[in-house]
């Protein structure tokens, strides 16, 4: 279903529409943008009035747009729509979604929810409508969210969903254990990369980019992605102190409200260059501009559970990758990612990479692995599983008639 912004489609669409609530983060949006190439998808983007104004739109009403072939319906809801007022307000979101589908002559086929906050909606709809869960994060360990409430709400979602997709084995295994579901009702769908990250970047583009940062000196070690307490800043400092490294380039936003004295130390280090937040699709140039890419995750619960998008973008860029062993999913790619279990080993691997040109066979293996893990590839699996669940639901409905 593809509708130009603020206009209704001139052609009625008869194919059933998959509704996704919500697509408010990149890692929730990307899989369903890709899926929209295979089936009609309506992505919901609810927000409160303050967020709406930050997006430079009116703090009320609904607005229609597109992301690739996915129709996006952003709708302003009252403050507390996802928390204290969820049971009251979320039915409005569902009503708006149904209205949007029917405005183009289509019926909804299923609902995919992407966070435990939608538990009230799942509870209301699950007996009469197919629902799936797409879990892209360890919501119980979000610092700003109530862990017990998240566990209770996620239990409702997982137990009522026809199928749940988890971005890591750790998240899937925990759900099977804690919510006592049949393992067949949960599968792993890791994060991925866009095919645009596989495209080579010209020397001219790289030179133009690096010219903005005159203090950069090769060899360049890059830390590309969000900057938060998931990173080992002491290890990054040691990399910067290494004689094998000319500069450490950090590209990405600092997490809101995050402060750390060790990060401040990095900012004062003349060998560390901070480029700030960049558009995600622009990161492919940054990635191909560096000589080695680092994934310096520290040992923590969140890294144990996660599926780092940066891993897949890094693979697509075809630059050598050195990572700590803090994330089990990163370790699954040890055939093309150099994994270190100690700081000393990490530094030695960085030095090893920078001391000699990367083997072409190794770089091609990285790109091969990246091609296996694109969002388009993920969409094929998601589509197949959703179709299977819809077919089972239809057969069950027929048997009851």
Regions found by a protein language model. Give the residues of each.
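Nucleotide-sugar-dependent
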Residues: 281-286, 293-315, 323-332
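A charged, aromatic-enriched C-terminal amphipathic alpha-helix characteristic of glycosyltransferases
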Residues: 357-391
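Membrane-proximal helix-turn-helix segments that form the acceptor-binding/catalytic region
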Residues: 98-102, 146-167
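Conserved acidic donor-binding segment of nucleotide-sugar-dependent glycosyltransferases
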Residues: 336-344, 351-358
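Conserved donor-binding/catalytic core segment of Leloir-type glycosyltransferases
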Residues: 210-231, 236-237, 248-251, 371
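Carbohydrate-associated surface elements
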Residues: 170, 189-192
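Nucleotide-activated donor-binding/catalytic signature segment of Leloir-type glycosyltransferases, i.e.
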Residues: 252, 260-285
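Acidic anion/phosphate-binding donor-loop and adjacent secondary structure
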Residues: 141-147, 176, 193-212, 217, ...
């Amino acid at each position: 279903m593809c509708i130009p912004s603020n206009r209704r489609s001139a052609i009625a669409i008869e194919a059933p529409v998959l509704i996704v609530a919500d697509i408010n983060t990149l890692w929730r949006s990307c899989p369903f943008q890709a899926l929209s190439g295979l089936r009609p998808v309506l992505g919901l983007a609810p927000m409160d009035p303050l967020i709406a104004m930050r997006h430079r739109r009116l703090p009320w009403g609904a607005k229609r747009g597109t992301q690739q072939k996915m129709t996006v319906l952003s709708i302003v809801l009252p403050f507390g729509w996802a928390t204290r007022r969820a049971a009251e307000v979320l039915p409005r979101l569902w009503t708006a979604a149904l209205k949007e589908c029917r405005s183009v002559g289509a019926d909804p086929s299923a609902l995919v929810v992407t966070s435990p906050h939608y538990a009230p909606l799942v509870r209301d709809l699950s007996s009469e409508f197919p629902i799936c869960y797409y879990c892209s994060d360890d919501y119980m360990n979000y610092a700003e969210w109530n862990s017990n409430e998240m566990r209770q709400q996620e239990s409702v979602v997982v137990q009522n969903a026809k199928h749940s997709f988890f971005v890591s084995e750790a998240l899937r295994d925990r759900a099977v254990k804690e919510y006592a579901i049949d393992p067949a009702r949960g599968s792993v769908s890791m994060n991925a990369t866009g095919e645009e990250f596989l495209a080579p970047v010209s020397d001219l583009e790289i030179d133009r980019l690096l010219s903005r940062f005159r203090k950069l000196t090769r060899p360049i070690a890059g830390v590309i992605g969000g900057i938060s307490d998931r990173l080992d800043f002491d290890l990054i400092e040691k990399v910067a102190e290494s004689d094998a490294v000319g500069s450490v380039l950090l590209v990405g936003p600092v997490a809101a409200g995050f402060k750390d004295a060790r990060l401040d130390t990095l900012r004062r280090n003349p060998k560390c260059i901070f480029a700030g937040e960049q558009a995600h699709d622009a990161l492919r140039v940054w990635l191909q501009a560096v000589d080695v890419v680092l994934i310096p995750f520290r040992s923590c619960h969140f890294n144990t559970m996660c599926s780092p998008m940066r891993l897949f973008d890094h693979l697509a860029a075809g630059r050598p990758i050195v990572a700590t062993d803090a994330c089990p999913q990163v370790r699954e790619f040890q055939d093309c990612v150099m994994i270190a279990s100690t700081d000393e080993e990490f530094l030695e691997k960085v030095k090893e990479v920078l001391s000699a040109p990367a083997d072409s066979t190794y770089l091609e293996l990285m790109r091969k692995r990246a091609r296996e893990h694109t969002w388009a590839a993920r969409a094929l699996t998601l589509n197949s599983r959703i179709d299977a669940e819809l077919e089972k639901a239809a057969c069950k409905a027929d048997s009851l008639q």
